């Protein structure tokens, strides 16, 4: 997807809030926008 590994890491190493879909830091425990605690890692593989 990205042209070089640093860019790909920057795009994919995030967590997504299950409540508001905000992008959060990989080390986050709560969402920065809504405070929700249920965060999932961003999917690394693209869907077919």
Curated annotation (Swiss-Prot):
Matches recorded under InterPro entries: Ribosomal_eL40_arc, Ribosomal_eL40_dom, Ribosomal_eL40_sf, Ribosomal_zn-bd
Gene Ontology biological process: translation
Domain of life: Archaea
GO annotation, cellular component aspect: ribonucleoprotein complex; ribosome
Alphabetized UniProt keyword annotations: Ribonucleoprotein, Ribosomal protein
GO MF, one example: structural constituent of ribosome
Keyword Ribosomal protein among record annotations: yes
HAMAP family: Ribosomal_eL40
Entry's family note: Belongs to the eukaryotic ribosomal protein eL40 family.
Protein name: Large ribosomal subunit protein eL40
Organism of derivation: Methanoregula boonei (strain DSM 21154 / JCM 14090 / 6A8)
């Amino acid at each position: 997807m990205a042209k070089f590994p640093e860019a790909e890491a920057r795009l994919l190493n995030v967590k997504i809030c299950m409540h508001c879909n905000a992008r959060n830091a990989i080390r986050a425990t709560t969402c920065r926008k809504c405070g929700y605690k249920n965060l999932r890692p961003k999917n690394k593989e693209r869907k077919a």
